[in-house]
């Protein structure tokens, strides 16, 4: 079966694994998914990323991060721009998530980046997701 929205699949797998407090989650790999995972790593939402090939398709293994007493680091994750309804923002309309407590992942002409970087570089683009 063909996957219509692989980014939503990544976010849903992370959300579901986080909800039941799994240590790792495995997702099929792609360049966009790697960039989103690297952003989650840089922002402190996941511990590490491992890439491996199971023979059929390359996979990403994401180690989820939890606080003391298994408190979730990711409280919410939401897909914004979808294949059926793309959401774009201008350079002066880049969204803030929870007044700066969360991040918005934005796809710009200079690559995929966090809302802070897009604002700093004066770039707009497609709003991929919110993470808080």
UniProtKB/Swiss-Prot annotation:
Keywords: Ribonucleoprotein, Ribosomal protein, RNA-binding, rRNA-binding
Signal peptide stretch: none
GO cellular component terms, semicolon-separated: ribonucleoprotein complex; ribosome
Coiled-coil segments: none
GO BP annotation list: translation
Pfam family for this entry, one: Ribosomal_S8
Keyword Ion transport set for record: no
UniProt keyword Ribosomal protein, yes or no: yes
Single Gene Ontology MF annotation: rRNA binding
HAMAP family named among the record's database cross-references: Ribosomal_uS8_B
Known partners and oligomeric status: Part of the 30S ribosomal subunit. Contacts proteins S5 and S12.
Physiological role: One of the primary rRNA binding proteins, it binds directly to 16S rRNA central domain where it helps coordinate assembly of the platform of the 30S subunit.
Annotated family: Belongs to the universal ribosomal protein uS8 family.
Entry protein name: Small ribosomal subunit protein uS8
Organism for this UniProt entry: Clostridium beijerinckii (strain ATCC 51743 / NCIMB 8052) (Clostridium acetobutylicum)
Originating gene: rpsH
């Amino acid at each position: 079966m063909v996957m219509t929205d692989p980014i939503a699949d990544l976010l849903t797998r992370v959300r579901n694994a986080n909800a039941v407090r799994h240590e790792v989650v495995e997702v099929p790999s792609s360049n966009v998914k790697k960039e989103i995972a690297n952003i989650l790593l840089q922002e402190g939402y996941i511990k590490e990323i491992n890439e491996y090939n199971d023979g059929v398709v390359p996979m990403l293994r994401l180690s989820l991060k939890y606080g003391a007493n298994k408190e979730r680091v990711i409280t919410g994750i939401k897909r914004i721009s979808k294949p059926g309804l793309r959401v774009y923002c201008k350079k002066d309309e880049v969204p803030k998530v929870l007044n700066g407590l969360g991040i918005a992942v934005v796809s710009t002409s200079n690559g995929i980046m966090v809302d802070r970087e897009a604002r700093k570089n004066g770039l707009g683009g497609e709003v991929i997701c919110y993470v808080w």
